[in-house]
């Protein structure tokens, strides 16, 4: 979802070098562009295909830094730039390749529980309407649906799977 990363990933914005910021953009956004460029050649030949990109709620809404209070975590500046860029590039791709019957969609998960501190989890759960972090099992069914023929008229969409985070 956000790998690889530079060593200063997760440090304060003021401490991130421009070269590091650029490297993260290259690894995590430009790589998607390059992959889609290569995939689209084959997908156009067979006149079908579906791509689901994984974005984030932080590509949709601004960061709530209060969930990081009392932890050694923060939300990296590059993360929001990458995820917001991915959502909008996805819209472009859907528009550009629609005539070729190619579909491009995104899912934007909220916080996914994975080895975060108990303080962060408590802070996060207090903010999200469903009062819990998500799991990969919460995300997978939507991705599977978007890749399936049942979604053959859905393109250019970004679906927030976030326990209500973006609803408030």
Identify the function of each model-found stretch.
Residues 48, 98, 103, 154-156:
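Short, small/polar-rich loop/turn modules that mediate ligand/substrate recognition or access, typified
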Residues 2-6, 16-18, 52-85, 90-99:
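Catalytic loop of short-chain dehydrogenase/reductase
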Residues 31, 35-39, 53, 89-90, ...:
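Hydrophobic positions on the long internal alpha-helix
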Residues 8-25, 71-74, 123-125:
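Short alpha-helical oligomerization interface
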Residues 14-34, 48, 52, 79, ...:
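Catalytic Tyr-X3-Lys loop
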